[in-house]
Amino acid sequence: VSKTRNVDNQFAFDLDETTLVIASSRDNRLALQHTDALLKQLDAWQQAGWIRPLDVRFAQLIRDLSNEQGRAPAPLVLLLAALVSHQVGRGHVCVDLATLMADAAATLSLPPEESTAARGQNKANQAGSDQELFADPTHTDPGQTRPSDLLAQVSVQECLVALNDALAVNDGSLTTPLVLSGTRLYLRRFWRYEQYIADGIQQRLAQPSPLTDPLSTAAATLSQALNVLFRPQGALNSQNSQSASNSQDSQSSVDYQKLACALAARSRFAVITGGPGTGKTTTVVKLLAALQSVAGESLERKEQDGKKGKKYRIRLAAPTGKAAARLNESIGGAVSRLPLAQLPGQVVLADIPTKVTTLHRLLGSRPDTRKFRHNRDNPLLVDILVIDEASMVDLDMMASVFAALPASAQLILLGDKDQLASVDAGAVLGELCQRAPDGHYLPATVQWLKAITSTDIPAFLQDSNGQPLDQAVAMLRKSYRFAEGSGIRHLAEAVNTNTLNADTLQQARDATFEDVVWLNGRSKKPSLESTQTLICGHAVSGNQQAFNNNGEGRMDGNGQPLPPPVGYRHYLTLMQDHNLDSNSTTGQWNQLAKSVLQAFSDFQILCALRRGPWGVEGLNDLIARHLRAQRLIPRAEGWYTGRPVLITGNDYNLGLMNGDVGITFSVPSNMGTDIGRGAGPQSDDEKTQTVLRVAFPTSDGSGDIRWISPSRLQQLETVYAMTVHKSQGSEFNHTCLILPDRVSPVLTRELIYTGITRAKNWFSLITGATSVFSDGVGQRVVRASGLGAVLDGDSVN
């Protein structure tokens, strides 16, 4: 240890001096020749905010472990160790050395954008997530040396040689901190997750199914059930397929929901993907009914033979409480509309679950550990598990799901492949669905689908070289939520396919679309002050008059008038106008809370960034102060009546999950213990003997209300504005997306698409510069991973 310290002292420097980076004033090769010089360089990058302290500590750990075993690591190995840790913090599962060496600056996003603000926006926060970035002028450019400068001195082959020679690196057969698989370098934990998921998928895809033989009794029952559940449809328009333009005629009679049910029914692992309103929930409910029909018919035959059998045990889950509540709301109605009496197998309502839980609750989370109660040694009691909003599930959680599933259990993933990937490392759904637009169904699959569904599969979906995974992935291609002329639909498709053109942008500026308006689209570079004034006014009113036809005259799918777009005055007025008091019942207060929570969800501001004038922190403060000036809230800081809050961390003691939204009320202090424990903050009028309580909807979808004292809430923030990431799993009648005045690495096509598709009926856009919208659409989220390669048979170990 003393020897190491002496060596360190030889390279001691003052971070405040111009000699901040050794290699900036000397030969860059020094950092790749001496371990201590390399670690000094990492320290400098960390001090500048380019990488995290965790990344530096990991490199130091590799050094220490290697020294303990008597062989000092090459500085290049330490550099790569720090960079793979950095990339995991940015959501990547690994570092592909070939990609890294081809363009290190772009791969690493190091250095960040050259301007101070953009550079700060690219810096991951100290908690380790790169998804919510901010402008911070205190972080500076650490001289001239960059990771790309160091990596330019070596080749991919030299990296491989150094890594293969390092004691801390292995191909996975030994326990080492780093795993090298081909040219992909992993932290061991994430390599194990990837392998576990791939093994779980492949094992399920290989399991024989009684449905595979189209002449079997089970297949006949499935076909009969699907014919009951799906009536013939008219022409369906393809959505989001790269090949659709060449194949529209061949799709005229294809019911993609029916095809998805058939494909998913015959495989122990299946994925159903589709954009908003394509009927993922409806499809999976019909799928479960069809599976129970097959199970019921089999049960009847077994009972006739004196054998025992059972229906499937089915569980429904979602990544967040908010997503679970949404699925709860929609699935109950979908189940109630099923023609169960007409199905074979005596399917009853009780056979189709309607209760949705979070993945954390399903797996049995435990405090202070990422390990769950259910695992390989204590698997779930389940035959079929359905996970909605699967795009939000990171690699770690997906591995935990596979660990907790019995080998015979069927896993069905639902989600939109084009939405933002999970906050933490991985893009599991996106990687599984890479080939979904073009199907790649084998001739045997095509023949089976024809036999079961009586459907001719379009030629563009057929591929004699299709992979096993392709046969278990189905894509829904028609949106039932948005009308043909919907601006939300048109804009989302243009963003998703990168086909934005001047005409589409002009229609948004002119409010030609009936449901979309770009509020400041005519101003190429509006001032910050004018944009903030626009945001504040929009937050209050929703700018109904800015929409086509003043936001009036639109009808929903049932021919009923749609309510016009609103702002936050809508829910705050509802709170101010009620006449409840200490004589009112808890039930009456609950009903008011339900109405207010529903009114609050009618409008939501979404941001790409967390900090800075364009981020949620700055805008929440700005909007609160404006609402206070408009006398819609009593104060703009602390706890107050009307304050909306977003839970930012799971609290299992309170039953609150990350993403849950509540509204603060002033309620009578004598309402009883069900309102919450603890004195908490007093209300804004001390003389009324009232207390502040936060109303949250229960996560079981029942519509009940839970009242929590503010003093018991630990991880939360005000939520007049939320990040697009936090909005996943939610939808709002009117969504306003606010984009900054310049492009940053987090402003991507996936983020913009996700923001647009959170809008159910109305979408408004405010930008700090008109160019950022198109420029952001041109940037894609590409996360390094090896899952697809492993599933395609790329086994290098």
Question: Where are the language model's segments positioned?
Answer:
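C-terminal accessory regions
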Residues: 497, 610, 660-667, 674-797
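Conserved helicase motor core of P-loop NTPases
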Residues: 418, 422-645, 651-653
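Residue-level signature of catalytic and energy-coupling elements of molecular machines
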Residues: 100, 197, 320, 388, ...
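Conserved, well-folded catalytic cores of nucleic-acid-processing
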Residues: 65-68, 103, 107, 166-169, ...
